[in-house]
Amino acid sequence: MSIKERLGLVISDKMDKTVVVSIANRVTHKRYGKIVTKTKKYKVHDPNNNCQVGDLILINETRPLSKTKRWMFKEIKQKSLKLDKDTIGE
């Protein structure tokens, strides 16, 4: 059995050592044939609090770590482009 890996976008990092990742999946509607985007949210264990909102990260499935956490952070594929006042010079 292979380990499942997903690529998703961090939408919340307000919890300690946990981030919420949204993964979009495009499927065809069974009756109408229209392509619909479905999203699913996963709670992901981030032991060092590396992830920030807007990061594109790779996660993989693991044993249950809590009631809702079954995914582990693997690596950051793309950092978010958050601009704060120090970087823009205000």
Swiss-Prot record:
GO terms for molecular function: rRNA binding; structural constituent of ribosome. Keywords: Chloroplast, Plastid, Ribonucleoprotein, Ribosomal protein, RNA-binding, rRNA-binding. Pfam families: Ribosomal_S17. It is found in: Plastid, Chloroplast. The keyword Chloroplast applies. One of the primary rRNA binding proteins, it binds specifically to the 5'-end of 16S ribosomal RNA. Belongs to the universal ribosomal protein uS17 family. This is Small ribosomal subunit protein uS17c. The lineage of its organism: Eukaryota, Cryptophyceae, Pyrenomonadales, Geminigeraceae, Guillardia. The gene is rps17.
